[in-house]
């Protein structure tokens, strides 16, 4: 881990409505302890009508930066100076000060790509990918894949109009397809990504036969409750490499911590075990 340059007390927070069940405090306090940084990370439940006042006076509330979650991500983009990633994704989840300027970024992109790099090195050798879903998470995934150099992304969604709208946003390398056409897009695809809630606890399963995927393909699922979805279980049974949603959750937290506390932390097996235990305890 990169060591901090200062020991001054720094505080960050998670702003949401509601935000009480986030694992972010557990993750950031683990890193603060490991790096010996005098700092804190707390949760602030802020309703939509109070969000602008809270963010514009973040320092007055005692914070040097913040994570932003539902339902504030789009509004955060408007109240800050966003970077290219936040603009492309259409949402900001991390706020930080650059002098007196409050800037924002979207670390879901880095979290997704870093998790793939850690879980399946060399995954980006494929020119083709299939992405399931066209919601907010899909925008971060598609942007990250295009930024990494993937040449063609088949984007499947139950609403083909929504898939087309996202494809129009990102250009000709993103091809919208009907949900029922997803199986036909799997042959030759070196990466399959599920960005939908299908397979999540309490949701219907993702009914997709992985047999057409190449033997060296990678399967990623953004769902992390349960830790191993049926999609990932089937992929592993076929000998395919996988990247789970918990890994993305951990990796997306790295950049925010670095921006606020001045040290780049590491995603370790110890941290993962800690968060896994918390997920099981609150299942």
Swiss-Prot record:
Belongs to the shikimate dehydrogenase family. NADP(+) binds at residues 133-137, 222, 245. It comes from Rhodopseudomonas palustris (strain BisB5). This is Shikimate dehydrogenase (NADP(+)). Shikimate binds at residues 22-24, 69, 93, 108, 224. GO terms for biological process: amino acid biosynthetic process; aromatic amino acid family biosynthetic process; chorismate biosynthetic process; shikimate metabolic process. Its EC number is 1.1.1.25. PANTHER family: BIFUNCTIONAL 3-DEHYDROQUINATE DEHYDRATASE_SHIKIMATE DEHYDROGENASE, CHLOROPLASTIC, SHIKIMATE DEHYDROGENASE. SUPFAM superfamilies: Aminoacid dehydrogenase-like, N-terminal domain, NAD(P)-binding Rossmann-fold domains. It comes from the Bacteria. The active site is at 73 (proton acceptor). InterPro entries: Aminoacid_DH-like_N_sf, NAD(P)-bd_dom_sf, SDH_C, Shikimate_DH, Shikimate_DH-bd_N, Shikimate_DH_fam, Shikm_DH/Glu-tRNA_Rdtase. One of its GO terms (molecular function) is NADP binding. Keywords: Amino-acid biosynthesis, Aromatic amino acid biosynthesis, NADP, Oxidoreductase. Pathway: Metabolic intermediate biosynthesis; chorismate biosynthesis; chorismate from D-erythrose 4-phosphate and phosphoenolpyruvate: step 4/7.
């Amino acid at each position: 881990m990169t060591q901090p340059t200062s020991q001054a007390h720094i505080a960050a927070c998670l702003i949401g409505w509601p935000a009480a069940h986030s694992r972010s405090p557990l993750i950031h306090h683990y890193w603060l302890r490991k790096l010996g940084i005098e700092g804190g990370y707390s949760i602030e439940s802020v309703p939509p009508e109070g969000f602008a006042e809270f963010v514009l006076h973040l320092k007055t509330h005692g914070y040097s930066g913040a994570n932003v979650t539902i339902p504030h991500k789009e509004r955060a983009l408007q109240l800050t100076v966003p970077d290219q990633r936040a603009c492309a994704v259409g949402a900001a989840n991390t706020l930080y000060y650059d002098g007196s300027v409050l800037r924002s970024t979207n670390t879901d992109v880095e979290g997704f790509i870093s998790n793939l790099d850690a879980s399946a090195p060399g995954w980006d050798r494929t020119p083709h990918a299939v992405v399931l879903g066209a919601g907010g998470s899909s925008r971060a995934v598609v942007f990250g894949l295009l930024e990494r150099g993937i040449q063609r992304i088949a984007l499947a969604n139950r609403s083909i109009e929504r898939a087309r709208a996202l494809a129009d946003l990102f250009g000709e390398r993103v091809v919208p397809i009907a949900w029922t056409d997803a199986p036909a897009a799997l042959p030759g695809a070196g990466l399959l990504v599920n960005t939908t809630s299908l397979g999540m606890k309490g949701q219907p399963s993702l009914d997709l036969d992985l047999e057409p995927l190449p033997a060296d393909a990678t399967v990623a699922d953004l769902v992390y409750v349960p830790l191993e979805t049926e999609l990932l279980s089937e992929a592993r049974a076929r000998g395919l490499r996988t990247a789970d949603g918990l890994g993305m959750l951990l990796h997306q937290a790295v950049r925010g911590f670095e921006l606020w506390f001045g040290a780049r932390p590491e995603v370790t097996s110890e941290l993962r075990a800690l968060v896994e235990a918390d997920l099981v305890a609150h299942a």
